[in-house]
Amino acid sequence: MNQERYLKAIDERCSRRTYITKDIEVEKVNSLQRCIKNLNEMSGLNLQLQLNGPKLFKGFSSSYGMLKGVGAYFALVGSKDDKDLLEKVGYFGEILALEATALGLGTCWIGGTYDRKLCAKLIDLKENEELVAIITVGYTPVDKTFKEKMISKLSHR
């Protein structure tokens, strides 16, 4: 992604927790997969795009009711032995979020309000790897929902 595209995505990006039922087009999935391949080569991480969001985010208990309609997510995975794992996941994960934003998709970083054991079964997780976080991704309503506005107010003081 070029610098101008990044700067525009930085200005546009905001956390979105409500998604609409619309599959991400093949061209956009392919673009995200190319980005992931490049980032994994640069970082040594095992970032993944998963299109099985409904399996992971079904029901209230899996996300405390804070997410709705999740169809896809990025699994942010890396080696347990990497002393810089958290820093790398933060840096390269945000690049993924910006790439998704540039493609017209919404994103939300999720640290712990999902079923980690189920997620580990749904993704490609090797024995020496750790799932650090996920980023939900997909199409969102044009305007934030009332719930999203309230959550945003509570989390940004």
Regions found by a protein language model. Give the residues of each.
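Acidic, surface-exposed loops and disordered segments
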Residues: 1-157
